[in-house]
C-alpha cells in the first residue's frame, strides 16, 4: 500500500496539461512512500492517451475505453475498481470540472477521505496533504 494512482484528465480529444502535473506529484509521493505510480485514463481514444502517459516516472498505465466524452458513472466505477485492485496509498485526481464531479463519489464508495484543492503532497512521515484555506 505504497503505490499512488493518478487519474489523467482529458477533454475534447486532448490530454490536459494538469495530467502531467499530477504525474509529477504522484511520482514524488510514490518515491517518498517507496511505491510505484499507476496512471489511468477513462474515456475515448485511451490508447493514444496511454502512449502519452507512458513516460518516465510512470510504472504502469491502465485504460478504460468508454465513449468519447466524460461519463460520471463509468469514471466513478473504473477508478473505484482500480483502487480496489491496486490498494494504493493515495489517488491523485484533477481539480477540474470532471474531477470534482467523480472524486466525491469515489471517496464515498470507498469510505475514504477526500481533500480537494490540494497544493502539496508529502509522504516522508506518513501521508500529508496540504490545502490552502482562506478567511
Provide a role label for each language-model segment.
Residues 1-135:
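N-terminal glycine-rich FAD/FM-binding segment characteristic of electron-transfer flavoproteins
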Amino acid at each position: 500500500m505504497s503505490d499512488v494512482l493518478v487519474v489523467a484528465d482529458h477533454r475534447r480529444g486532448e490530454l490536459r496539461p494538469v495530467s502531467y502535473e499530477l504525474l509529477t506529484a504522484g511520482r514524488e509521493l510514490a518515491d517518498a512512500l517507496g511505491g510505484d505510480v499507476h496512471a489511468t485514463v477513462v474515456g475515448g481514444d485511451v490508447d493514444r492517451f496511454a502512449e502519452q502517459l507512458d513516460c518516465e516516472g510512470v510504472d504502469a498505465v491502465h485504460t478504460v475505453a468508454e465513449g468519447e466524452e466524460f461519463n460520471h458513472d463509468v469514471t466513478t466505477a473504473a477508478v473505484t475498481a482500480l483502487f480496489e485492485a491496486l490498494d494504493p496509498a493515495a489517488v491523485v485526481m484533477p481539480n477540474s470540472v470532471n474531477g470534482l464531479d467523480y472524486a466525491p463519489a469515489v471517496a464515498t464508495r470507498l469510505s475514504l477521505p477526500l481533500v480537494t484543492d490540494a497544493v502539496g503532497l508529502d509522504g516522508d512521515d506518513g501521508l500529508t496533504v496540504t490545502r490552502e484555506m482562506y478567511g
